[in-house]
Amino acid sequence: MAQPGLPIEALPAWALLNGITFPHVKVANIEGKGFGVVSDGDLKPDVPLMAVPNSLVLNVQAVDEYAKEDKNFKQLLDAVGHHSARRDILLFLLVQLVLASKAHQAPVGVSNPWTEYIKFLPKTVLVPTLWTEDERLLLRGTSLESAVNAKMTALTAEFDAVREAASSLPSWNDVLWPYEDGNSSASLRSWILLDALYRSRVLELPKSGESMVPCIDMINHSTSASAYYDENTKDEVILLPRPDSKISSGEEVTISYGDAKPAAEMLFSYGFIDPESTVESLVLPLEPFEDDPLAKAKLFAFKDMPKVHVAHDKGSSAVSWNSPFAYLMCVNEEDGLDFRVLQDSEGGRQLRVFWREEDVTDRIGDFESLIQSHEVPTLIKLRVVTVVQERLQQQLERAQSFADLSALPIGDVDLLRDECRQAASLLRSIETGLLEVVIEDLEKERRMLLADENVVAYLGSMETAESDLVGEEASNEPEDFS
């Protein structure tokens, strides 16, 4: 389904009709950024730049209210909604996209202001889920490679679930399933686009929580933001200049999407990387040892996704890493780890985790502290540091191996968008530099742990025990009298 569009010049009329006021700013095309908000005169402190009525704020409460007006939408919402704010808002936007389509014929949906506003939103966003397959290959060797693949799988499963539910709802069956010519009022691509619009535009409001706010969602990001959003006593969402900012006529008005977001998260959610960000960090998935007999039990008990998080503050030499699962991964039965299936008070059976005879099921992510009760905690720390270092080294080598386009199975390089190539290259450069710094720091920590007197004594005793075992086995071999 082709997304309908309206020229941005028509936005002031739509805003006036729906009670949005922005007398001191205007929405305009910003070179290299798409749409943005610029001042329409010298701005004064404490004077709102924009005010949006609460009735236009799109959140879970607004979706529930809309469901009361549209029984057909309520059927769809009850069938596949109520999982999260995001899912409910996406279902609402899907209906508005269908209603706004000229090809729409099915008797579903009730028009509201968002039916028109969605026509002002971009037809694509430069987030990786909307890159072509060849463009997504540019992310090989970066932390986004697995994240984007997982997101694409999840989005496909989500839309399949929506369509499957729609098949039993007569009013929605024709909308979400292809016609004889193969077209449909809404497609998987529509769902992926709406997800991208949501992730790149959602705001965390002080009172209303996760919300999309028309017009305010046109404002671009800057680490040196000149404005911020809030909710006033009338529950309007307002845009205010920052107290320390001076915005001249014609200057772009910006807000901060979050100063601490890493490059991968910025690209994943917003489609760009802020080169002025002061924090470099990345998150990598972590796999348990293949030969660990307790691997499945550890994964089941841990529940969360096993990962390694590393970070570096550009303003200092300090680096940090964190991986709760790595600590669980590196302890075994001989250290004092045990899994037991016990019966609960209701007669059910539960997998419980024990560490040195103490039930630590509710502290499964706190083994960094729990290992202090081990005879040689520095030994386990050495194992963990080695595991994390090897995982980062593996990632670094992979990132470097795909740095050249010739190493990627891309069909036609000329079809790759420059924005995607530049973003992927910058992400790879940032993450490669970060990995090198953290690996070097981990090597220093590993050497220090290897020199620890308790570790040296333990490793020495293990070598002695192994030598004795080898000697004992040799003495038990029958003599050869030939």
Give a label for each model feature.
Residues 58-119:
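Eukaryotic helix-linker segments that join adjacent hydrophobic helices
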Residues 2-56, 61-64, 109-482:
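Long, positively charged leader/targeting segments at protein N-termini
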